[in-house]
Amino acid sequence: MSFVVAAPEVVVAAASDLAGIGSAIGAANAAAAVPTMGVLAAGADEVSAAVADLFGAHAQAYQALSAQAALFHEQFVHAMTAGAGAYAGAEAADAAALDVLNGPFQALFGRPLIGDGANGAPGQPGGPGGLLYGNGGNGGNGGIGQPGGAGGDAGLIGNGGNGGIGGPGATGLAGGAGGVGGLLFGDGGNGGAGGLGTGPVGATGGIGGPGGAAVGLFGHGGAGGAGGLGKAGFAGGAGGTGGTGGLLYGNGGNGGNVPSGAADGGAGGDARLIGNGGDGGSVGAAPTGIGNGGNGGNGGWLYGDGGSGGSTLQGFSDGGTGGNAGMFGDGGNGGFSFFDGNGGDGGTGGTLIGNGGDGGNSVQTDGFLRGHGGDGGNAVGLIGNGGAGGAGSAGTGVFAPGGGSGGNGGNGALLVGNGGAGGSGGPTQIPSVAVPVTGAGGTGGNGGTAGLIGNGGNGGAAGVSGDGTPGTGGNGGYAQLIGDGGDGGPGDSGGPGGSGGTGGTLAGQNGSPGG
């Protein structure tokens, strides 16, 4: 590590550049001296002579000023060069003194008092940072058949080292865990990515390493490592979990993603007192298997939003659930599901003030009774609105698929808050030669209930039907004391609309039924 602010080699290089600039300017001044100082008169008259003398006087004044500037420039370059030498000497002296100080601590505890830990050899852990100050070393990347090395831990102040990447193998090797941050200040290190699966059978990717925790008062948790890639036709490895944030302040780390699907994304790390939860890891697509999005981490106990749930492109897999907020904050949104899976539910809002997170959408389904939108999160405190329900999936397959139902809206807070709107039901496709019979449009989600003061959420609209049973709209949420009931969602093609929610008992109107 550098023991002074200045970098001597940079200062020396700058001084050399300045010297070169000075030489170029000096050469240009010398070349201009003769023609400018010896200007001939245009004629023999007195006016021409006076003009020539004026130009010559200006040239002489310029040359005198240039000489002074060149002297200052030379002195400045000498000062920079001398300063660089002084910095280098001071750094060498400090390093020597620090080596003497670190020696006993290294011998007794296996780590210096001040200084960064060494990076690990292939597959080996990084060295710990100094007891007083210093970052942990990075774990070494794994070779063939080797897991990634864990990142080194920090001491009192410093960041944990990053975990190494897992090595390739018949089954990919795990990535190394991120090191923990300093006991006072410092972030956790990121987990290493999982290794590549290369074997002929069961060649799945390695799991990502977990992110390091910020165990001190201040710091962010490290991100989980990405899952490794599987061989063609095989699943990837699961994503690593995110690390927790610092005791007083810090966000949880994000969960690791899964690029090739068929394994779950990593869960986001939790915050502790103040901070946001980490987002859950997202999942790519693979030919077979299940791969759900990671759940979002919870927000800080005092203040912080929940992390968003991870999304998934993998078939028959669900989006991750959003994390819950603490005392103040909003719940995280649920992740979406792309094919034959349900959207993730939204997280709950703060226990005092905060909104529920929105439910995740479901994009399409092949008719396997899945593909529902996630429910909106409830506002569980005194003030806050419920989250909106996610939209149901569109029916696109050949098994008489119906659209997925929309998610229900979350309830409003106990005192003041509106109910969340229900998600719309998914549509079905138009009958064709390939798909002669289609299912019903998805049912709209119900609107959420309001708090003592607030409006009920509107019901979701039914999905458009092909030749199946017309879809039904969702019911509107009801108000409690003061507020209007939510409107019912409209049905499709003559299908029943949802009922309107009742208005408040003290003041408010009933919601309109869906058409």
UniProtKB/Swiss-Prot annotation:
Superkingdom, natural source = Bacteria
Parts of the chain that traverse the membrane:
1-21, 165-185, 199-219
Q: Which residues form a coiled coil?
A: none
Query: How does this protein lie in the membrane?
Result: Multi-pass membrane protein
Q: Name one Pfam family in it.
A: PGRS
Which residue ranges are recorded for the region named Disordered? Answer: 349-368, 463-515
Annotated InterPro entries: PE-PGRS_N (IPR000084), PGRS_rpt (IPR048996)
Q: Which SUPFAM superfamilies match?
A: PE/PPE dimer-like (SSF140459)
Q: What is its main location?
A: membrane
Q: Where is the signal peptide?
A: none
UniProt-listed Gene3D superfamilies:
HP0062-like domain
Gly residues bias locations: 349-360
* Annotated PE domain residues: 1-93
User: What's an example GO cellular component term for this entry?
Assistant: plasma membrane
Q: Where in the cell is it found?
A: Cell membrane
Q: Which UniProt keywords apply?
A: Cell membrane, Membrane, Transmembrane, Transmembrane helix
Query: Which family would the database say this protein is a member of?
Result: Belongs to the mycobacterial PE family. PGRS subfamily.
The protein, known as: Uncharacterized PE-PGRS family protein PE_PGRS34
